[in-house]
Amino acid sequence: EAYPYEASATRIESALFDDWETWDDEQFEIHQWVATGERLDRESFGRYRAEGGSIISHSRTEEMTLAAISHPLTMIASDGKLENGRGHPRSTGTYAKVLGRYVRELGVLDLMDALRRMTIAPAERLQQRAHSMTQKGRIRMGSDADLTIFNPDTVIDRSTYTEPDVPSEGIEYVLVNGVVVVDEGELVEGVRPGKPIRSLR
């Protein structure tokens, strides 16, 4: 699984950072506090770690991202989320960025391969643990009508690390379980037709 960004996100209190007090000063500069967008130093990292919260770590290069995205076994996915409009741009831009930048602009993937990596490949990977995934990632009679209608000539992400909640361009309609949740590029307020996906017990 990969998403098309050179930064990751996690909690600052994660065990990943248990050795932070031994870091050189420049190691702090790759970290960004989600709530304010500020880059951190030793003092602010220690203060926020005691407080707890989300952090973005700018720890990869575009070459690393290209290698991950183009690998034949890679699926395109993101577990990112927004809280009060703050978070990682992968929450809103992952799929549009792959389609706009890595398919249309760079030609790293062809369109059908990118769509496979976003839909049927993750569904097949997960269906052994969650039977309801057999109804995802497919357009056929009886499957869940989860559909995204986009313009391949214009689709692109617009969210950033400081404005992660900006909607992508070129996504005209989104249906979840057959219900329109994005209509002519605009979010339909108050509509929540999604259902939980539960693992097999």
Question: Can you describe what each PLM-predicted range is?
Answer:
Residues I55-S59, T65, L106-D113, E124-D165:
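Acidic, glycine-enriched loop/beta-strand segments at the rims
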Residues M75-I76, G93-K97, R101, D113-R116, ...:
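Feature representing long, continuous alpha-helical segments
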